């Protein structure tokens, strides 16, 4: 009798185990839900921005093909009173990058960002990173530059560098800001990153 009971218990255990395995087996729908969605490229550095690394044609079709996960749109822009058409890359209703045209307006000259979503070469972001933590070899050459009417400066590896970090000096600073070397060293260290800029290769 004991053998019969033990055999029945063993058979029941095997049946329950098989049932458990069937319940744990994922359905085709569950398998597809585990697929990782593509990640939007928010990086900018010497090699490009948003996955763009060439002087693309300044048209929506070309830019959409190069940055398919972004919402791409034409916008009117101006620099020093001169108007031109730029292209924006946005996600979630917020602009992340802006593509600026070259002199003839046919190709991308630069891609700039002042979005906190964009990440620089060391994963730094606008409004939080300071000049003091920038890699020295990446900011060897600096020039004074006004930022929204305030004193600031832009730095790269050299005068012809293709990636620039733009900083604004702390609010309230009333000392000299031009040339760059005239800015107080302590002020430089506390200056905040406000823009990153990639320059496209010349056509």
Predicted regions and their residues:
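A broadly tuned "polar low-complexity/structure-edge" signature
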Residues: 152-153, 162
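Repetitive helical segments and hydrophobic/amphipathic motifs
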Residues: 11-12
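Short helix/turn-capping signatures at newly exposed starts of structured segments
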Residues: 20-150, 156, 179-203
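Bacterial N-terminal signal peptides that target proteins for export
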Residues: 1-8
């Amino acid at each position: 009798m004991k053998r019969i009971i033990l055999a029945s218990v063993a058979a029941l255990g095997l049946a329950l185990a098989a049932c458990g395995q069937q319940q744990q087996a994922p359905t085709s729908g569950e398998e597809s839900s585990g697929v990782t969605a593509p990640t939007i490229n928010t990086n900018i550095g010497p090699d490009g921005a948003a996955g763009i690394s060439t002087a693309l044609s300044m048209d929506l079709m070309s830019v959409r093909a190069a940055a398919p996960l972004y919402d791409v749109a034409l916008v009117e822009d101006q620099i020093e009173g001169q108007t031109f058409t730029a292209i924006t890359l946005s996600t979630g209703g917020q602009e992340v990058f802006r593509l600026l045209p070259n002199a003839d307006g046919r190709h991308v000259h630069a891609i700039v960002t002042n979005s906190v979503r964009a990440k620089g070469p060391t994963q730094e972001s606008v409004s939080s990173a300071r000049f003091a933590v920038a890699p020295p070899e990446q900011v060897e050459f600096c020039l004074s530059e006004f930022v929204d009417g305030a004193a600031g400066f832009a730095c790269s590896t050299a005068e012809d560098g293709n990636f620039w970090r733009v900083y604004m000096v702390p609010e309230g600073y009333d000392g000299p800001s031009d040339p760059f070397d005239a800015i107080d060293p302590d002020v430089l260290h506390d200056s905040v990153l406000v823009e990153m800029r990639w320059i496209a290769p010349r056509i």
